[in-house]
Structure formats: structure tokens, C-alpha cells
């Protein structure tokens, strides 16, 4: 299975949920937002399985002043 994560091709041997992908890719579990195919997913939907060819964007919140 192939997906795109933050503009990089990622090949997976198995189908993952959004939550599993976040852990596997080493993203922090807090302070991030995840969009799949241009739609931001609330955390309640992170158990959604990713489909082949999905585009995933992970954005980390940054504080500024």
C-alpha cells in the first residue's frame, strides 16, 4: 500500500489507521492536527483506516508571540 505523508511517498506492508500511522511515523500524540485527502480529522475519527493512495498531512502546533 502506498500513501503520501507530508509530501513524501510512504510504502506500507499493511493497512493502518490514522492513529497507527501517527505512532509509526513518530509524530507526537498531542499538539498535532491530521488531514486526510485535504479534510482535517477530529481525533474521534483517527481509528479510520487509510486507503491506498491517501494523502496525509500532519501539522504540529507551534506557539508564538
Question: What spans do the regions from the language model cover?
Answer:
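Ubiquitin-like/PB1-type beta-grasp interaction modules and other compact soluble beta-rich domains
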Residues: 1-64
Amino acid at each position: 500500500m502506498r500513501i503520501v505523508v507530508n509530501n513524501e511517498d510512504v510504502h506500507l506492508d499493511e493497512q493502518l489507521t490514522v492513529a497507527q500511522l501517527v505512532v509509526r511515523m513518530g509524530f507526537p500524540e498531542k499538539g498535532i492536527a491530521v488531514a486526510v485527502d485535504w479534510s482535517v480529522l477530529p481525533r474521534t475519527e483517527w481509528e479510520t483506516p487509510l486507503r491506498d493512495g491517501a494523502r496525509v498531512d500532519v501539522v504540529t502546533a507551534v506557539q508564538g508571540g
